[in-house]
Amino acid sequence: MPLLWLRGFLLASCWIIVRSSPTPGSEGHGAAPDCPSCALATLPKDGPNSQPEMVEAVKKHILNMLHLKKRPDVTQPVPKAALLNAIRKLHVGKVGENGYVEIEDDIGRRAEMNELMEQTSEIITFAESGTARKTLHFEISKEGSDLSVVERAEVWLFLKVPKANRTRTKVTIRLFQQQKHPQGSLDMGDEAEEMGLKGERSELLLSEKVVDARKSTWHIFPVSSSIQRLLDQGKSSLDVRIACEQCQESGASLVLLGKKKKKEVDGDGKKKDGSDGGLEEEKEQSHRPFLMLQARQSEDHPHRRRRRGLECDGKVNICCKKQFFVSFKDIGWNDWIIAPSGYHANYCEGECPSHIAGTSGSSLSFHSTVINHYRMRGHSPFANLKSCCVPTKLRPMSMLYYDDGQNIIKKDIQNMIVEECGCS
């Protein structure tokens, strides 16, 4: 019974979402919605006045996104020499050889970085005891099995210095990767440093750092290239030997693994936990070495491939992106808009047959797939609903312009340009 109730609730929720969403053509031409694609798609494309109507829709949309009721009145424009000098000094744009201003696309780069960060996983792996003394073993989580591009990898080690013996001595800490090679295939390359080869084992210097031994603190050792090499070879474990030759004479020591809890025996012969030992163990464990890995899937990974939206070429009727560029010079707006030179007012148009509704890659694919499942089977209230061709990916746009007070404004506008279209 609870399962049936849950299904009914989800069904009703989807129906409410669809009923509350505007359908193409439900908005008046005079409105300036936040979605320029929706406004342009409802306008006639073939009539004699179609182009002016579309340009007017774009104008209203730009003013709306800049929170302006009308275009600024630039009666006394700033001299071009002063304008170009200010732009150079403030680093808000670049001036080309032809005198045109190219705005710095900081927001576009930030959007790309944010998208990249969303695809990046961060994995922290704590060290285990290695097979030999002063060696550490790191086993990279299975979470990283699909990750093949290393953005950053670091080994963190804690250097402990006794309070009574703090000198100004500097010590050198080295990390060596222990490697196993098949018999007769030992080829370390130019960057390898062999130290005490024994049979099939060899060592490669991973990282080296000179640190101050005056205080107890963490030290970071970059190992990105080594982890990248491991992933390229299909491996997931790293064995590291730690060397610090001057540590003993300076009184410093590296915390490689937490000490095991000591057991004390009471008068009755029973074992009891030593409170001091427990605190010491907890402190040691808090300084346990770890590997921090930031990695992502490669561009050609099958899980990263998603269906790209179609570009309208006049040959297909299926939902696609229609390119539409409005030059600010052509519409007489280049006197108050400094940069860019125009606006890519792309919009979505085309049919959405049932077999492509809710395609992967669409931000609306969950709801559209559920609704389409019931619609195709004639279930009420979805039987008469139709899929719509809507933007599925938008990108931001930066603008540099004058306001009514001749001030230069730079504004970053989110979701301004349609990049891809899909069926809802």
Curated annotation (Swiss-Prot):
Residues 264-306 are annotated as: Disordered. GO terms for molecular function: cytokine activity; growth factor activity; hormone activity; identical protein binding; peptide hormone binding; protein-containing complex binding; signaling receptor binding; type II activin receptor binding. It holds the Pfam family TGF_beta. It is found in: Secreted. Its main location: secreted. It comes from Rattus norvegicus. It comes from the Eukaryota. GO terms for cellular component: activin A complex; enzyme activator complex; extracellular region; extracellular space; inhibin A complex; perinuclear region of cytoplasm. Residues 21-308 form a propeptide. GO terms for biological process: activin receptor signaling pathway; androgen metabolic process; androst-4-ene-3,17-dione biosynthetic process; autophagy; cardiac fibroblast cell development; cellular response to angiotensin; cellular response to cholesterol; cellular response to follicle-stimulating hormone stimulus. Dimeric, linked by one or more disulfide bonds. Inhibin A is a dimer of alpha/INHA and beta-A/INHBA. Activin A is a homodimer of beta-A/INHBA. Activin AB is a dimer of beta-A/INHBA and beta-B/INHBB. Interacts with FST and FSTL3; these interactions prevent activin A interaction to its type II receptor. Activin A interacts with ACVR2A. Activin A interacts with BMPR2. Inhibin A interacts with ACVR1; this interaction creates a non-signaling complex (NSC) that inhibits ACVR1-mediated BMP signaling. Inhibin A interacts with ACVR2A. Residues 1-20 form the signal peptide. Inhibins/activins are involved in regulating a number of diverse functions such as hypothalamic and pituitary hormone secretion, gonadal hormone secretion, germ cell development and maturation, erythroid differentiation, insulin secretion, nerve cell survival, embryonic axial development or bone growth, depending on their subunit composition. Glycans are attached at residue 165. Residues 264-275 have a biased composition (Basic and acidic residues). Belongs to the TGF-beta family. Disulfide bonds join 312-320, 319-389, 348-421, 352-423. This is Inhibin beta A chain. Keywords: Cleavage on pair of basic residues, Disulfide bond, Glycoprotein, Growth factor, Hormone, Secreted, Signal.
